[in-house]
């Protein structure tokens, strides 16, 4: 395997591609935006026909990724920490229903409100 020097968000995106995702869904919000942008322009993602989609909000992004997982496909959903609050309803319900194909939720917190209107530790959702 070829070694590449990647930024953190690029490594997350490349790991998802290498892990066999069939789709990535996101709502733009720094610092999570760059994960989806990397997948959108990655030649390997295009060759593998990975579905790449921006959603109208975090809830619909999560629901679309969850639907892909219910269909037996692997998916990735990306959002910033305040977006997880928007997606909380389907997120908490999916903890009960489970997933089938695999679902990775990439939530980017902003310590010290670096790029957000508030500070939140999303690990409390765990």
Give the positions of each predicted feature.
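Thiamine diphosphate
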Residues: 1-126
